[in-house]
């Protein structure tokens, strides 16, 4: 999990391979390569506060998904594993709740522990989402067919939460269902759930996707408590398909007209990913429009490569997102892009920030795998998986040196001349404040505080093999954003 390396950028993106010894964010499938070059960054004073440090016992290991916050200030999230045994993460993952105490600390409660692939799933990798009644919904690997599940957790009056599997994905034996749901879910106003699977959907003629290149799906609740799935769109890549992308890793997002927007990590003409739009039509089907196909070095200037995270919309209908690599910055450390909506329905892409690598301090971030959020002033906030070495070219995770830095939290502010100014709110440094923030986006409360998770780092705990390890943290960045008006 914690062996970190420099990424390499290649046109044939099938898996994200870390060549310095590192763990891949969220089991990504892309291949990115990055070189270390001098860069200059602007740093703001750190405002990070660690709310909870995972101990590697029964409280969870590797909080890969982000957190959501309820009206009482409780935080909810998932961990990929349960505990540390003989020096390695084991168990099938869990869903947790963090409750603030009068002392200002947070107390953890495990809401559900997954039992394994053929039971109720395993290894949740995304955040959860609330419905209006206070139930939680999420996705996990495994299930009866090994393609993943969608689950519901309902609170009971006496305290425990009850799990119900509302869908088992099955992309095998002629089924055109999706497989491997990695992103989080979203609700519409009618209580339907929407999400993506990174594989599946049929498409057996596709050159690169044995069981399909991924899907966008909908789950509709029935009166008897069951849910009915429908595939809104199945992605294709080659073999006579439309080459509209493959491997959607994150959730989709609605605009005010009910259209859905999302990204694919790979696929498209240059196999560097796409941004797509799905429009509902009266027949109940959805029509796909490709808004942008990433080309990176083929374009001048380069436009980025491999968007793992989804997009966020501003009030004008413009889209913003991140790419793992490319972008034309020194070393190609990734990019933040904007797709501007035109009067003719077309979108024009511009790169509003190019991440650059610094051999002397690694000050800028690299690999912005996480999604963005926008505050009421139009500022953008996100994370980078690596980078941010400050004046020290090395940070430590469990005694291992991470030469590029252990990740950053950044802010992009629009300026009067149409450009964007970058500042860094925090650089993860060592085994106290966490490291390697995961691809899920940050969460913002009404006061402008930001919340997120780092899959590694935190206080060192002695494991059963006698070594010392860290298992990740939940953090807060105080007062970073402009509160909603």
Per-range role (PLM):
Residues 2-485:
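Extracellular beta-propeller repeat domains
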């Amino acid at each position: 999990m914690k062996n970190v390396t420099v990424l390499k950028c290649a046109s044939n993106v099938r898996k994200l391979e870390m060549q310095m010894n590192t763990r891949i964010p969220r089991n990504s499938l892309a291949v990115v390569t990055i070189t270390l070059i001098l860069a200059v960054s602007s740093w703001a004073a750190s405002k990070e506060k660690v709310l909870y440090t995972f101990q590697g016992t029964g409280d969870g290991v590797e909080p890969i998904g982000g957190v959501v916050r309820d009206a009482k200030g409780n935080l909810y999230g998932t961990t990929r594993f349960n505990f540390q045994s003989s020096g390695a993460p084991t168990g099938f993952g869990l869903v947790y709740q963090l409750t603030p105490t009068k002392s200002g600390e947070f107390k953890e409660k495990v809401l559900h522990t997954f039992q394994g692939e053929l039971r109720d799933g395993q290894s949740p990798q995304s955040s959860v989402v609330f419905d209006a009644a206070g139930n939680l919904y999420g996705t996990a690997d495994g299930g009866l067919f090994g393609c993943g599940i969608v689950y519901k957790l309902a609170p009971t009056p006496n305290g425990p939460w009850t799990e119900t599997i509302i869908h088992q994905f099955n992309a095998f034996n002629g089924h055109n269902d999706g497989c491997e749901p990695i992103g989080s879910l979203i609700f519409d106003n009618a209580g339907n759930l929407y999400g993506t699977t990174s594989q599946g959907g049929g498409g057996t003629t596709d050159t690169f996707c044995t069981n399909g290149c991924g899907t966008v799906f909908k789950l509709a609740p029935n009166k008897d408590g069951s849910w009915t799935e429908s595939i809104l769109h199945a992605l294709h890549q080659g073999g006579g398909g439309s080459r509209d992308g493959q491997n959607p890793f994150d959730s989709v997002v609605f605009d005010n007209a009910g259209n859905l927007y999302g990204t694919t990590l790979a696929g498209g003409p240059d196999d560097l990913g796409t941004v797509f739009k799905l429009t509902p039509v009266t027949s109940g089907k959805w029509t796909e429009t490709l808004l942008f196909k990433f080309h990176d070095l083929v374009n001048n200037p380069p436009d980025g490569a491999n968007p793992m995270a989804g997009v966020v919309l501003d009030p004008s209908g413009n889209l913003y997102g991140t790419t793992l690599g490319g972008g034309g910055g020194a070393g190609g450390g990734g990019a933040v892009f904007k797709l501007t909506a035109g009067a003719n329905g077309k979108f024009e892409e511009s790169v509003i920030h190019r991440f650059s690598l610094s051999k002397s301090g690694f000050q800028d971030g690299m690999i912005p795998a996480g999604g963005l959020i926008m505050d009421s002033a139009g500022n953008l906030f996100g994370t980078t998986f690596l980078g941010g070495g400050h004046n020290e070219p090395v940070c430590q995770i469990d005694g291992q040196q991470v030469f590029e830095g252990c990740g950053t939290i950044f802010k992009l502010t629009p300026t009067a001349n149409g450009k964007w100014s970058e500042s860094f709110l925090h650089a993860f440094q060592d085994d106290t404040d966490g490291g390697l923030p995961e691809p899920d986006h940050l969460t913002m409360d009404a006061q402008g505080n930001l919340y997120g998770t780092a899959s590694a780092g935190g206080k060192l705990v002695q494991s059963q093999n006698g070594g010392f390890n860290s298992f990740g943290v939940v953090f807060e960045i105080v007062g970073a954003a402009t509160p909603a008006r």
